[in-house]
From Swiss-Prot:
<keyword id="KW-0436">Ligase</keyword>
<comment type="similarity">
    <text>Belongs to the class-II aminoacyl-tRNA synthetase family. Type-1 seryl-tRNA synthetase subfamily.</text>
</comment>
<keyword id="KW-0963">Cytoplasm</keyword>
<protein>
    <recommendedName>
        <fullName>Serine--tRNA ligase</fullName>
        <ecNumber>6.1.1.11</ecNumber>
    </recommendedName>
</protein>
<dbReference type="GO" id="GO:0005737">
    <property type="term" value="C:cytoplasm"/>
</dbReference>
<dbReference type="GO" id="GO:0004828">
    <property type="term" value="F:serine-tRNA ligase activity"/>
</dbReference>
<dbReference type="InterPro" id="IPR042103">
    <property type="entry name" value="SerRS_1_N_sf"/>
</dbReference>
<dbReference type="InterPro" id="IPR006195">
    <property type="entry name" value="aa-tRNA-synth_II"/>
</dbReference>
<dbReference type="GO" id="GO:0016260">
    <property type="term" value="P:selenocysteine biosynthetic process"/>
</dbReference>
<dbReference type="GO" id="GO:0006434">
    <property type="term" value="P:seryl-tRNA aminoacylation"/>
</dbReference>
<keyword id="KW-0648">Protein biosynthesis</keyword>
<keyword id="KW-0067">ATP-binding</keyword>
<dbReference type="InterPro" id="IPR045864">
    <property type="entry name" value="aa-tRNA-synth_II/BPL/LPL"/>
</dbReference>
<keyword id="KW-0030">Aminoacyl-tRNA synthetase</keyword>
<dbReference type="InterPro" id="IPR002317">
    <property type="entry name" value="Ser-tRNA-ligase_type_1"/>
</dbReference>
<feature type="binding site">
    <location>
        <begin position="353"/>
        <end position="356"/>
    </location>
    <ligand>
        <name>ATP</name>
    </ligand>
</feature>
<feature type="binding site">
    <location>
        <begin position="235"/>
        <end position="237"/>
    </location>
    <ligand>
        <name>L-serine</name>
    </ligand>
</feature>
């Protein structure tokens, strides 16, 4: 959530910055609500001051033995007026809050202004795409003989679900374990196991609600009169980041660095017809997530560090990639700045997103009321960052395509072999007649 004081001081400036993100701020509606709030708040304060004055007057009158009934009647009437005024003020503040909850974060000044992914800016590349001396297959054609089973996945759960079997399932697990081990042993993160189902207020904290309700899988339990609504997580960023909600952390405890391997569930409501083949866009997929909770002055150094942690995974796997700075129109709702990592997929002859690392600054912290005690001992909002380290399914796709061989086998990257019992390559099972 944006700082409402920022809007009160520079409404037109904030509206311009939000317009760069493709969001139209209803300046007139906000101004009208603010004017009404100020008027009611002023009236409430005047009533409070009048009641306080009359209360003192009653005390003085009683000391003199004078009749206070008329003044007490006025005080009683003021009390009724104050209750009505406070109720109206609460209603206005709730409407302001709803408006604020729908506003995205403002972009950091270093973010390129643009409309969509065409305006993103490439920062650097690593690795040279492999030159094949045979016809390259995509991950579906490579993986199906090795244990990718899209047919059974669809039969069990519908489109955009996949079954993994045998060595492909083991390779998928090996990737996740390798990522977690690297982040915990080399990058300083604490491994965390989180709930996969969370309460609605948790999603408000990290910004998925109210705007992206249609992208979430909702779980309801109980009868018609006592229904409890919860949601499957779309990323473990949600549960990891909310571990500091409604708390004041000792400044000496920062930075807090957490990582988790979890399934992620997304309805992909706006993705009809996109990436319908294979594992690129699934309703259920695994991801290793990185989250950092830091002091404001260190958050952009932490963002660079986090990008480096995601890059390290790709480099150790020997997968060519590029780093992209997202423009204002392509960033996620909560982000102030985002770097995407895109891995090379030879069958598509292009780079595809495999990690997204974002600094949300105080946007999520304000929604969660997550604070730390600064050097002066005063509570201050933390900054929160999140990043994929990496999306496991897409990393599997990249390994299958980049490490495929002419005979249909797949070479196991060296760093994964200890997790695969020393296996150097995955071969299709022999056909039986």
């Amino acid at each position: 959530m944006l700082d409402i004081q920022l809007l009160r001081k520079d409404l037109d400036g904030v509206a311009k910055r939000l317009a760069d993100r493709g969001y139209t701020l209803d300046v007139a509606a906000f101004s009208a609500l603010e004017a009404e709030r100020r008027a009611i708040q002023t009236h409430t304060e005047e009533l409070q001051a009048r009641r306080n004055s009359l209360s003192k007057q009653i005390g003085a009158m009683k000391g003199k033995g004078e009749d206070t009934s008329a003044v007490m009647a006025e005080v009683s009437g003021i009390g009724d007026d104050m209750k009505a005024s406070e109720a109206k003020l609460g209603e206005i503040q709730a409407r302001l809050s709803d408006l604020m909850l729908g506003m995205p974060n403002v972009a950091h000044e270093s973010v390129p202004v643009g409309k969509d992914e065409a305006d993103n800016v490439e920062v650097r590349r690593w690795g040279t795409p492999r030159q094949f001396d045979f016809e390259v297959k995509d991950h579906v054609d490579v993986g199906t003989p090795l244990g990718l089973d899209f047919e059974t996945g669809a039969k069990l759960a519908g489109a955009r679900f996949t079954m993994l079997r045998g060595p492909i399932a083991r390779l998928h697990r090996a990737l996740a374990q390798f990522m977690i081990d690297t982040h915990t042993q080399q990058h300083g993160y604490t491994e965390t196991y989180t709930p996969y189902i969370v309460n609605p207020e948790i999603l408000y904290g990290t910004g998925q609600l109210p705007k992206f309700a249609d992208d979430m899988f909702r779980v309801e339990k109980g009868g018609a009169e006592n229904t409890v609504t919860q949601y499957l997580i779309s990323t473990s960023e949600i549960s990891l980041t909310n571990t500091v909600r409604e708390s004041i952390v000792d400044g000496a405890a920062l930075p807090i660095k957490l990582t988790a391997h979890s399934p992620c569930f997304r309805s992909e409501a706006g993705s009809y017809g996109r990436d319908t083949r294979g594992m690129i866009r699934q309703h259920q997929f695994d991801k290793v997530e990185m989250v950092q909770v830091v002091a404001p002055e260190t958050s952009y150094a932490a963002l660079d560090e986090m990008v480096g942690h995601a890059e390290a995974i790709l480099q150790k796997l020997g997968l060519p990639y590029r780093v992209i700075t997202l423009c204002t129109g392509d960033m996620g709702f909560s982000a102030a700045k985002t770097f995407d990592l895109e891995v090379w997929l030879p069958a598509q002859n292009t780079y595809r997103e495999i990690s997204s690392c974002s600094n949300t600054e105080a946007f999520q912290a304000r929604r969660m009321q997550a604070r730390f005690r600064n050097a002066q001992g005063k509570p201050e909002l933390v900054h929160t960052l999140n990043g994929s380290g990496l999306a496991v399914g897409r990393t599997l796709v990249a390994v299958l395509e980049n490490y495929q061989n002419a005979d249909g086998s797949v070479t196991v990257p060296e760093v994964l072999r200890p997790y695969m019992g020393g296996m150097e390559r995955i071969d299709a099972p022999a056909q039986t007649s």
